[in-house]
Regions:
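Residue(s) in the substrate-gating loop at a strand-loop-helix junction
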Residues: 154
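Canonical Rossmann dinucleotide-binding motif of NAD(H)/NADP(H)-dependent dehydrogenases/reductases
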Residues: 2-33
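Alpha-helical segment proximal to the catalytic Tyr-Lys
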Residues: 132, 182-184
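C-terminal substrate-recognition "lid" of short-chain dehydrogenase/reductases
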Residues: 228-252, 257
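Active-site helix of classical SDR
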Residues: 127, 170
């Protein structure tokens, strides 16, 4: 797929971090980008910077995603590219111990369900609704290509740490979704690929002490640093351009394998 002004894209979680970098990179090639996010202030600013559209969106809601797609398609046309970056990563142990009483209690189901709802259900919600639109487009080439969907899993899908049961389960499911989704959508010429990022310097790291950031960076074999959001965005661009990449999960992690804790 060539990236230019004839192509429309949506990026969830596009107001910051990996999503913002992806939106900016696609827009730099002329792609018409719509950002789906809950952060209205940041999303509006980024959209203004790139000449795109911001749509306040709850990815866990069918109606919210449908409304956002309607707005984006009204302005830019039906998207050929959908990138799912929206996600949350709270840590919580399965069994919690009260420090004062020593009483043991299980992790509440609501907190587990919320992570799965945003990271997995939200990803599928956008994937399915976007694919339904892409499927009706005219093919771009002799292969019959109509579009590409890039989902964001995590190295936690394979190397989940203590306190990451919900997060790792949700991202493991996103990874597992990749191949069957690619096979399912192949009849429409829609590719599906997942990226498994390692430790990236996103806004959530801004509040972390510099010494701890250095410790995290030292755990990465090479290059011995945190990933940069634009490196994720560069891979998204490569996936969009390379029509043979389909049904694959790609680790982007500097060869790190996460320790148990």
């Amino acid at each position: 797929m060539q990236l230019d002004s004839s192509i429309a894209a949506i990026v969830t979680g596009g107001a910051s971090g990996l999503g913002e970098a992806t939106a900016r990179r696609l827009a730099s090639h002329g792609v018409r980008v719509a950002l789906f996010d809950l952060d209205e202030a940041r999303g509006t600013r980024v959209a203004g910077d790139i000449g795109g559209l911001f749509c306040k969106t709850d990815v866990t809601s069918e109606a919210s995603v449908a409304d956002a797609l309607k707005a984006a398609r009204s302005r830019h046309g039906i998207e050929r590219i959908a990138v799912n970056c929206a996600g949350i990563a709270p840590g919580k142990r399965i069994v919690l111990k009260n420090r004062e009483t020593g009483a043991l209690a299980p992790q509440d189901l609501a907190s587990f369900s919320k992570v799965v709802s945003v990271n997995l259900i939200g990803t599928f919600n956008v994937l399915a609704q976007s694919a339904a639109g892409m499927a009706g487009l005219e093919p771009l080439d002799e292969d019959g290509s109509r579009g590409v969907i890039v989902n964001t899993a995590s190295v936690a899908a394979e190397d989940g740490q203590v306190g990451q049961a919900a997060y790792a389960a949700s991202k493991g499911a996103v990874k597992a979704l990749t191949l069957p989704a690619a096979r399912d959508l192949s009849q429409y010429g829609i590719r599906v690929v997942a990226i498994l990022p390692g430790i990236f310097h996103t806004p959530m790291f801004d509040s972390i002490a510099e010494d701890f950031r250095k410790t995290l960076a030292a755990a990465v074999p090479f290059p011995q640093r945190l990933g940069r959001p634009d490196e994720y965005a560069h891979l998204v661009e490569f996936i969009c351009r390379n029509g043979m990449l389909n049904g694959e999960t790609i680790r982007l992690d500097g060869a790190i394998r996460m320790a148990p804790r």
